[in-house]
Swiss-Prot record:
Substrate binds at D193, D195. Its EC number is 2.4.1.32. This is Probable glucomannan 4-beta-mannosyltransferase 14. Its main location: Golgi. Keywords: Cell wall biogenesis/degradation, Glycosyltransferase, Golgi apparatus, Membrane, Transferase, Transmembrane, Transmembrane helix. It is found in: Golgi apparatus membrane. The chain crosses the membrane at residues 42-62, 366-386, 403-423, 482-502, 503-523. It catalyses: GDP-mannose + (glucomannan)n = GDP + (glucomannan)n+1.
């Protein structure tokens, strides 16, 4: 074996030696490592495809056979179509909880919609759980509650005095502890977030499932969005959420009677909620935590896709990013805390345990986020610099195209936005990956809770917030997105000059997407200091 003393590098410059070392490093270390990573990503890609295909097939079969919840389960409306003529004794006692935290733009909407529900007035209690610290928000809530109380509605405004222990879970728990909940013998509890506006017949269409099917613990309604057409970002959110409800929630409800509770627009059987030990604030996804624990005790859930509740999508990127952090960090952290509980549980079958651990948590809450960013934004771009590594088309084109089409079908009107959806979702995958890792590693932001900013239906408010004077260009810059965009652009340029494929087309487009987000030109530019409380 040649050494330096043999004269191998005698005629080489320093740059030549460095080049030789780099070339050897490339062949001995980088190429083998990258090949293994590509192979691993191919396996993960197949697993995600199988899971997506499974859910799509289930939904297709359910639709073809017409197996709606009303046909599969016992469902009977209450005796009289006229709520004023129907004996109130036919209707169970319902508690409606509306947790609020400094949401003055929307709180009146949700309170008003809840008070207009078609249900005997003596058979429902509306409980406004106001943890607000802003005086204006507190005043609006008090006035709205007094207004409806004067019209004969049983409505309670409960304030914890700025002591927001446990965030939303803490507020819901505190609400259940009030003596009148037991005195009125409430059987079911409905949760609406502050921006949710149910239709008057919401209870009439959901509660019968619980009344006539004692094994059902939760009825989850779908969502519809009042501001979906506000900007491209809200349209993309609508596409993702429509897929979540139409495919993920519906398939879980149809096969196993399980899905993750969405935290709002749902009706719980109070007995089942209490048997599952109620709300816990150990993570920032108290809704999913409760759903898993209730399911492990034998409860079943039903998703009713023909009942939808209007709400508002976050229209600024900042608000959306904070929301996605909570939705990615929380499930990963919950998985870490509850995995052993699932394994040791004796009430559910092995198949259900596998589904919870592998499909529900591992694939859909952890792997999908990390894989999407790492493969499509890190590993795949790197392969253009290593021509020795070939990535098959089924990994880069066929599988992702199929999964993308399955997502887009849920929102036909936005199908033409499919390219924007792909590029934006890859950008968001970076934030979701960070959130997932924070949840798994339990770093400092693991209990970070930032209320998603909503603007309500005030056009004046929206106009005033669109282009504020203090929102300068440097304030918009997001350096993580810019750095990833530069990496993708460099890889794309290298492939354009030296490559033999057309991967540079994707790389240039994806780099542009990262740059656009990086300079703050996505969503409605509504800068503000977010309301944040973290432990």
């Amino acid at each position: 074996m040649a050494t330096l003393s043999d004269g191998l590098f005698d005629d080489m410059s320093v740059l030549g030696v460095i080049g030789y070392v780099l070339e050897q490093t490339r062949f001995i270390f980088l190429v083998p490592i990258l090949k293994r990573l590509v192979n691993l990503c191919q396996v993960v890609s197949v697993l995600l495809f199988v899971d997506a295909a499974y859910m799509a097939i289930v939904v297709a079969i359910v639709k073809l056979l017409g197996r709606t919840p009303q046909k599969v389960l016992k469902w009977e409306s209450f005796k009289s179509d006229d709520i004023e003529l129907a004996p109130s004794s036919n209707h169970p006692m319902v508690l409606i909880q509306i947790p609020i935290f400094n949401e003055k733009e929307v709180c009146q909407l949700s309170i008003g919609a809840a008070c207009k529900l078609s249900w005997p007035l003596d058979r429902m209690i509306i409980q406004v759980l106001d943890d607000s610290t802003e005086e204006e928000s507190q005043k609006l809530v008090r006035l709205e509650c007094k207004k409806w109380e004067s019209e004969g509605i049983t409505i309670k405004s409960e304030v914890r005095g700025g002591f927001r222990e446990g965030f939303k879970a803490g507020a819901l728990t505190a609400g259940m502890k009030h003596s009148y909940v037991d005195e009125y013998k409430c059987e079911f509890v409905v949760i609406f977030d502050a921006d949710f506006q149910p239709e008057p017949d919401f209870l009439e269409r959901t509660v019968p499932f619980l009344v006539h099917n004692p094994e059902i613990a939760l009825v989850q309604a779908g969502w519809k969005y009042g501001n979906a057409d506000e900007c491209c970002m809200t349209r993309i959110q609508e596409m993702s959420l429509n897929y979540h409800f139409a495919v993920e929630q519906k398939s879980g409800s149809s096969i196993l009677g399980f899905f993750g509770f969405n935290g709002t627009a749902g009706v719980w059987r109070i007995k089942a909620l209490n048997e599952a030990e109620g709300w816990k604030d150990r993570t920032i996804v108290e809704d999913m935590d409760l759903a898993v624990r209730a399911y492990l005790r034998g409860s079943k859930f039903v998703y009713v896709d023909d009942v939808k509740v209007k709400n508002e999508l976050p229209s600024s990127f900042q608000a959306y990013r904070f929301q996605q952090h909570r939705w990615s960090c929380g499930p990963a952290n919950l998985f870490k805390k509850i995995a052993m509980e699932i394994i040791k549980n004796q009430n559910v079958s092995l198949w259900k345990k596998v589904y919870l651990i592998y499909n529900f948590f591992f694939l859909r809450k952890i792997v999908v986020h990390i894989f999407t960013f790492v493969f499509y934004c890190v590993i795949l771009p790197a392969t253009v610099i290593f021509p020795e590594i070939e990535v098959p088309k089924w990994t880069t084109i066929y599988i992702p195209a199929t999964i993308t089409i399955l997502n887009a079908i849920a929102t036909p009107k936005s199908f033409y936005l499919i390219l924007y959806w792909i590029l934006f979702e890859n950008v968001m995958a970076m934030h979701r990956s960070i959130g997932t890792l924070i949840g798994l590693l339990e770093t400092s932001r693991v209990k970070e809770w930032i209320v998603t900013q909503k603007l309500g239906e005030s056009n004046n408010l929206r106009e005033n917030l669109i282009f504020p004077d203090h929102y300068s260009f440097p304030e918009r810059l997001r350096w993580r997105e810019i750095m990833v965009g530069m990496y993708l652009f460099i890889c794309g340029y290298y492939d354009f000059v030296f490559g033999r494929t057309y991967l540079y087309v994707y790389l240039f487009l994806q780099s542009i997407a990262f740059f656009v987000v990086g300079v703050g030109y996505v969503g409605m530019p509504v800068p503000s200091t977010p309301v944040q409380t973290s432990e």
